[in-house]
Amino acid sequence: MPEGYTHVRTARKAAHAIHYKVRCPEAFAAGANGPDVFFSFEIWKRPRSRRFDLPALGSRMHEEATGAFLQSLLRHVKTGAQVEYTLGFLSHYAADTLLHPYVAAVCEPGGPYAGKGGHGYFEIALDSTLHAEDTGVSQVPADDACPLPKGEDLAEITLLLQQALRETYGAEVSAECLADAFYYFNRVRRLFTSRHGLRRGLFYVVETFFGGRGFLTGHVSPRALALNLPDDWTDPATGQQHHGGAFALLKQAERLSALYMTGALQHWMGVLPQTDIVKLLGSRDYGTGTETERSTAPAAGPAAPPPDAAGPTEPQPSTDKGE
């Protein structure tokens, strides 16, 4: 993660920066939530009781064959909804790989979000802060964080995901499970708004007995952001020192998202060769922002089609300079 609204906001700002007119906003936002959509699928069931363990697959997608999955999405795009889902997904990848190391840093011992559940508390506080900045209201409605794609758009997105998941991870996931994942993601998110704190208090009690601190309350908005966030920090994964805190990193994420979107559009239009889009996107772990043996692993599923089979046919992706 970050949380949903942060991802959707980052993707929208990136699209605006390159004058791309979003025509399927729910599909675009669904892509901006990336693999996180899978984490709510039948979460109330034990993994072995689920129709498919999508939460485990979502975790795998953050760490394994990340670049191969992005290339598979790019290769199988055919429709407008699929174009915009993929553009949103590229933004999710950009934001996660830039912001996650900072999230890990502020959750280290001595950091403002050290302790049980700190990761979630920071991310929902950032979500609440950005939503308040944009709308004047810090409570984040589900339809702002994860609007639900419907009808033909949803069918086209699930088809794209089926192809990419099969090709990259060898995972055969039904269209019904994928469609339900988007539905559950939106519905579960609706449980985590608590304007007057009643649900937060209830979830706090539940956490005492199930799941541990932050399992539920780490997703509840509104939440105030700590005032002592560092601008200078050390990446726990690499030991590298950085200057620039959460809001500077958000601006970087918008720029990187815009770069990835531009690259994808140019690739589909035949301007950017396959080797260049592979180099541009890389294959980084979503959590550390670095390339690892696992993140750079090749696709585990059936062989991909030749490069000349790639690219959307209709409608073509377009930009609108009037936006």
Which role does the model predict for each range below?
Residues 1-86, 93-323:
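N-terminal leader/auxiliary helical segments
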